[in-house]
Amino acid sequence: MKDINKRIASLPEEKRKVLARLIARDTGARESVAAADEIRPPEHTLADEYDIVIMGGGLAGLTCSIHLRRALPQARVLVVNSTKYPAPEAAHKVGESSVEIGAHYYDTVLGFKGHLEDRQLRKMGLRFFLPYRDNRDLAKRVELGPFENHILPIPSYQIDRGRFENMLAVAAGKEGVGFVDECKVSGLTLSQNGEPHVVELTRAGEQRQVKTRWVVDASGRATAIIRRKLDLTVESEHKTNAAWLRIKLPIDVEKFSDDPEFRGRMLTGFRQYSTTHLMDRGYWTWLIRLASGSTSVGIVADPRLHPLETFNNVDRFNDWLDQHEPHVGDLIRANRHLIQDFIALKRYAHHTKQVYSTNRWALIGDAALFTDPLYSPGSDFIAMGNTLVAELITQELAGADLTDRVEFYNWLYRDFLYDTAIRIFQDQYPLMGNAQVFVAKALWDIAWYWATIGPIFFHERIADLEFMKSIKPILIHFQDLQRKMQDFFRAWDEATIDEVYCDAYVDLTKIPFLYPLVHLEMDAGYNADQLREKLADNVSLLEAVGAEMYRGAYGALPTEPMTSSGLTVSEHLERAAKRADVRGQLHRLWFVPEREAAMAEAV
């Protein structure tokens, strides 16, 4: 205990404050959200006509409405939501975990940092536990996550969706947004000649029509009003399934092991505030603590290895956990009476032929597309999509022609952002059983995010048409790197599929080229020219990272690896040699297989 107190005392003041908030929240010192927050938006009387109607009042729709009113204070904005507000806490929705872009959008762009710090949980990064034998010995599993940087300088949050959306609905009303709940969109007529669109609404058995210049579809994956009406849905080749529940129980993964070395890697109690991923071949299981005291527990799996039918109800879900993640299975089984809800979702990934139209409609959130929950990208897509929509509407209402902008934004959101993201996940679930390959892949995936779209969004350039067009060749280069590296990881896994790794941990915040040079510079305040130069430098850095990863796997692959840019092997290794810092720092990612370690010990 004295050692822990010393370590807490040595933390910077800001980190101690965050720790104090977490402790206060866990001990019940915080007053209830019902007593502290307004949770019912003001009543709104429907008008005959609006500038913008947003169909859907969930996370995407509410944040978009606030964003639009800030950008266009005179605009008449209506949000139509089919369900009743206030929503229950621990609302049964995906999107409880945010990462840098989404968190920055919520806390800084929209200005809700106070709510996120006081009413939600500050997240301690992403944390991964790779498989070892029957997965009962957590301390033996390879662990990837932050250890010493307990309070990361660029914040992210674990978000209780019900609590957050209740606050957003009230905030939208205060911004002048019209909000109606328990109201269904029963029809939509899209104008083709510049006249207003017509939205048909049904509320309490009464029907009403409203006209609008713009219509934004935030109605979600299942309803997807415009995507279904215009037959825009594209079936994704990424066919994974998910099931999850909320349980009124704070789950601390650290309590799954009493190993002193495992416990001593970081301050006691901090692991539970990470988004925790328990992984094995073909699946991962999430644990997400929520500020309301609940924990979200989910299974995401490739049906070729783990069919949805094996975990698609509570009993099967628990049985599946007993077999694959026994610590979680035991805990759920002992507390079945605390389960709050359960849902299973088949083939959650989906795509669209079009996101934005010169005909004054747009898709946002899950009504547009969704990739995969692994790295918590849902709020990122909301942030980027809302920003693009706000710029489109602002430009159009000012009289601008949207043809060029709509064409580029569709390419950016659909063909660049979605395509590069889906490749991270598609056909990659089997390699989650390979600790060596997945740790390298996770570093690559996170580095790619920090090096590309992260700094673009943080520097408020995502909707800057001139700037984004100027860096399109860089983006295409990033996209090509992504495609070929994901192919490489798959080949590497197939070549080393039988290896077992254990007794290792990696802290990505301790890799100098990655953390300070990429992550911390996402928000460096660059002007357009400096940011363009930084992105070009980041391409070069990622090439070197990819080259060194090829070098590390070279002996395992059945054929000579080619570099992402198509260089010969000799040119490839020469490129890697120019970044000796990358080589030295990535060396800590290479693990010794258990069989080799045992042989060395025997000798």
Report the location of each language-model feature.
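Conserved FAD-binding subdomain of flavin-dependent enzymes
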Residues: 67, 88, 92, 97-120, ...
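A conserved beta-strand/loop capping segment in the N-terminal third of enzymes
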Residues: 108-158
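Glycine-rich FAD pyrophosphate-binding loop
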Residues: 69-94
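Flexible, low-complexity inter-domain linkers and amphipathic docking helices that mediate domain-domain
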Residues: 1-37
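Beta1/beta-strand and adjacent pyrophosphate-binding region of the FAD-binding site
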Residues: 43-60, 78
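Predominantly flavin-linked oxidoreductase catalytic cores and closely associated redox partners
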Residues: 87, 171-328, 386
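FAD/FMN-dependent oxidoreductases across multiple families
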Residues: 281-283, 289-293, 305-427, 431
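C-terminal helical "tail/cap" subdomain of flavin- and related membrane-associated enzymes
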Residues: 393-603
